[in-house]
């Protein structure tokens, strides 16, 4: 064995490549070994350093891959054992054990997290060269007994199913020990680069290679100063020193110092020396030179998005200077926090990248489909799960519009559960759903699912066959092929499909002869899919590489950007969480000298120093270290390592907000520039210098020219929320000149509430989602129908009998039967409505001096050639003197307010009066009023009553009164009825004023509507809060930002309120 160390200013790879070339020139076969995470980059670096740029004599690979070169022919043809397969084997083992067999873990048998921990422990045991029987000294002896039962049973299953229990390194080591490879190894030289420690498995293999290979060469970075130190605790080279010293002691060899021809920039060397001096308690009498600072940058940004954008702009600048994407490396302090953001931002700046991390399959449509399938079976055809299956795009031949229509109907009819999905859809609504088409679609969905879900407990092989048959029926494979929109997506789908078929194969192999329920089968496949990962190799090598900063090696790329280096992530504090604690691992390691667990937490300090050292030397030309103030919506502090750099004299540059400028980095990319222009267009203008204004004026002019060529438009607006007028063609279609505009009291109220709401409801005809479950509208229809029947009954039957008959016959109508007999909740609503009817009906019995002359009266009120007002009057009453009045049933409290009417928000009663005046020969003198009747079950607070007597009954009837507009002329006739006339009496002249102003409100609204321009102007009564419909989801209206666009209501003091509003009405209606 040969141990080599060198300073950070030299290239260890060049030194080791020279050693490899010498061995290759002598006829030896050389294996150049790199860590798993670096083998791809190391292969490219090694081949670059070779004069011939390639050779068959030197193979750059990993330990695992090297073992396959030697054992591929002699390895037994056994099944491959991966993590998913291991999890299934442990699940099967736990199925065969009873809870009482496992005192410690019996309650966790079906816990997926526990099974994952078992898989991790099994892999650790293999790497540590330990068996489950070596787990002595645990905190609880029962833990070892349970683990022995589980793992031994799992290993028995592996043997039965012909799985290879040995790892590739174990098979390689066994072949060497048996002397099967002596001839080959005697002609082999092994060069090892990039390691600072070996696992127990690697350590054992290394000892065998040292005894059988021609030579083993290992290199590591250690300074000569550190190598000569006797006390190395806390030294930045502590990990490498321990690594070399352990090997030197074990193999009785002295490490040698070497140098390379390539020497990197002195700035990085000087920074390393300062860093070393800080941690080995020595002092230096010099600082970084001014020109050294040109190679380092410390950035501070407010949050991650700005940080990534600054990096992207800097990369574009490097390209402008002539560098390539492959010259750039981006390191992430927290992969999970940055992974979702960095992709879209780099795409915006058109920067091709390769993320050096396996992607989880959990977000892929195939995994979502399998998960929805499993949940549909487990939760008995829940609607959300069925729809998620359809929306995955992998079920059947349905387009998006079909799925949307199916979803809309199932929500309306509340279709959920197998019973409702299996029956034909028969319920319809005013929207007239295409039931024939929906039932055909329902059958295409239900039949294959029903055939699969009816599977009883049976052999796993049979369940897999039925699942595959189901997947063929729904054309899963064909739909999977149709998902891809690009070559990259095609490659991703191929990798996901391969993992899926591997999981099915493993399940068939392990559970083929075990009896399982379908729910267990789907749950196991779903768990395997959700935990699986895949990798996609980049289509070109000229990309920006992105990976975690703790995987970096010295001198990786000319330009390195390390971002997210906050105190929480740099250094990383690794704590193991599993079935064994670190204390238990340490006790086991004390007993087993040459076989040991890796305890990450025990090596945090020296590993973090090693990582920081590699990071500070990762670049060969320029290193940028960046830290955000806020990461994952949490404030974080500077890393202690960055604080050290600041003490060395490196300035911390506050990058601030990513303002737009006329720098090359801002305008070097068309797509990014266009997105920035759009961002400017959406925000308030910021303070700009004359030079800035001139620059952006020219840029906008150029962009508009380019956009016009592409028939695109850059929108401009003076207000935050603005609307466009309808085109003349649309206005002519929606509001023909020769046809009167149709309005109603409700439509007029909506218009004055918020003009844009009128546009949505009555121009675009947008409606809220319907539901078969009764709402306030359906409740109102029911109450109207009961009272209509009651008032039509002129028989001599007692009033209570008439009421019972009206309720009974209304309940028997098919429409109300479908709605109110669907479930217990609807039946409860019906019971409440019946109570309301019984409570309100006595008011009709008391008013014996009135006669109902008409109900549910349709009217069309002609207001000239411009407007036709339509509506339905619930009831028309006639007093004993022949005067007529209008009753409007309300399911909620309502009363006429002259101020609300003046502002256009309560025109209903006055509109009905105008209609009654038009459709009857009576003049204004013979109209006694228009009123609301609140249909309610009065609630009284019994605490306020001293005793139960007539006052209690009077209070009930006081709540059941008619409230509205009444004629002062009919005051005497109204006094004997249940009419609340206080502050509600109007003279004939005043009633005429109300009618004229009501006409003015309609004409004013119609004139504005026909112009085709609808404002976003919900009303406000106080100028501080908005009461009108804001439609935030559509208009993005915000009261604090858009109060200026709200319509301010006219409000007057309560004193003389009526007279003042009438005066205003007279003025406006006669303009």
Swiss-Prot record:
Gene Ontology biological process terms, A to Z: double-strand break repair via homologous recombination
Gene Ontology molecular-function annotations: 5'-3' exonuclease activity; ATP binding; double-stranded DNA binding; helicase activity; hydrolase activity, acting on acid anhydrides
Disulphide bridges: none
Required cofactor names: Mg(2+)
One Pfam family of this chain: PDDEXK_1
SUPFAM superfamilies (UniProt xref): P-loop containing nucleoside triphosphate hydrolases, Restriction endonuclease-like
EC number of this enzyme: 3.1.-.-
Keyword tags: ATP-binding, DNA damage, DNA repair, DNA-binding, Exonuclease, Helicase, Hydrolase, Nuclease, Nucleotide-binding
Function (record text): The heterodimer acts as both an ATP-dependent DNA helicase and an ATP-dependent, dual-direction single-stranded exonuclease. Recognizes the chi site generating a DNA molecule suitable for the initiation of homologous recombination. This subunit has 5' -> 3' nuclease activity but not helicase activity.
Note: Despite having helicase-like domains, this subunit does not have helicase activity.
PANTHER family: RECBCD ENZYME SUBUNIT RECC
Oligomer status and interactors: Heterodimer of AddA and RexB.
Record-stated family: Belongs to the helicase family. AddB/RexB type 2 subfamily.
Name of the protein in question: ATP-dependent helicase/deoxyribonuclease subunit B
Gene designation: rexB
